[in-house]
UniProtKB/Swiss-Prot annotation:
The keyword Iron-sulfur does not apply. This is Suppressor of hydroxyurea sensitivity protein 2. It comes from Vanderwaltozyma polyspora (strain ATCC 22028 / DSM 70294 / BCRC 21397 / CBS 2163 / NBRC 10782 / NRRL Y-8283 / UCD 57-17) (Kluyveromyces polysporus). Residues 73-99 are annotated as: Disordered. Residues 81-97 have a biased composition (Low complexity). One of its GO terms (cellular component) is nucleus. Belongs to the SHU2 family. Keywords: DNA damage, DNA recombination, DNA repair, Nucleus. The keyword Nucleus applies. Plays a role in a RAD51/RAD54-dependent homologous recombination repair (HRR) pathway to repair MMS-induced lesions during S-phase. Required for error-free repair of spontaneous and induced DNA lesions to protect the genome from mutation. The lineage of its organism: Eukaryota, Fungi, Dikarya, Ascomycota, Saccharomycotina. The gene is SHU2. It is found in: Nucleus. GO terms for biological process: DNA recombinase assembly; maintenance of rDNA.
Length: 248
């Protein structure tokens, strides 16, 4: 993978879904060769697994009923199973859920959004906790990410880790439109990009395909393919509880 930011990865991600709301074979093949092949395949498998849950915290007030329209990690399997009664209520909830999810998709790509988001990936290994992913800080709690990070620490002990893993762009004339692996995105005087070829796991790549591309891509996996769940959280207590549960 080339770290040159003339390669605008987020534009490629945005073309992964074509105008027919289908995966574009040409772009999929291109990305397959652009990234390490096994890594890209694992990221695509995650997107189709049904194990990815995007939690969204909105600073404004949201009614408790809107929170209940989407399942949590714990009850997702049950909530996908149709009930023997109350079909009309389920249809109404599904319609409301779609509207709510559409709204979240648009807000997540609004440049002025105040929404905070985290990805939780359900694991299938016994006694393994869910995996926590944060794009804004380029962090993943998985063992693979931690092993890459530790490797960089060991290789460059005399150099500050930020000098090894962060690429700074100070010249405004060289600013990139790419959103992939960008941190501190709201700075007006500097751009910072993580050297993703040194520090990336399939969870970060999959999450980037969702949130560093386009609303079309995010909408495909959350509303069309329905393999990624959007879960809105309306208050800070629930948000903190989510993080505490992941740590514990």
């Amino acid at each position: 993978m080339d770290t040159n930011k003339s390669v605008i990865y987020s534009q490629f991600f945005s073309k992964l879904i074509n105008d027919n709301n289908e995966m574009d074979d040409t772009m999929t093949s291109f990305l397959y060769y652009l990234f390490p092949r096994e890594l890209f395949i694992r990221a695509l498998s995650l997107l189709d697994s049904g194990d990815m849950f995007i939690y969204v915290l909105e600073n404004g007030n949201i009614s408790s009923s809107s929170m209940n329209l989407v399942p949590t990690v714990c009850d997702s399997d049950e909530s996908r199973s149709p009930s023997s009664s109350g079909n009309s209520n389920n249809e109404a909830s599904n319609e409301s859920n779609t509207i709510d999810s559409n709204s979240i998709v648009e807000e997540l790509y609004d440049i002025d959004t105040e929404l905070q988001n985290r990805l939780i990936v359900k694991t299938h290994e016994k006694d393994s906790p869910p995996i926590y992913v944060d794009l804004k800080t380029w962090f993943c709690s998985c063992d693979e990410f931690n092993s890459y990070f530790n490797l960089e620490l060991q290789k460059n002990q005399s150099i500050p880790i930020q000098d090894t893993l962060i690429r700074n762009i100070d010249d405004i004339q060289e600013f990139s439109e790419d959103k992939f692996a960008q941190i501190d995105a709201h700075s007006l005087s500097k751009q910072k990009y993580v050297c993703h070829e040194k520090l990336m796991c399939p969870h970060l790549l999959a999450y980037s395909i969702l949130l560093a591309s386009s609303t079309k891509t995010l909408r495909y996996f959350t509303l069309v393919n329905q393999t990624v769940l959007l879960i809105r959280i309306s208050n800070m207590d629930e948000w903190l509880k989510l993080h505490i549960n992941i740590v514990s």
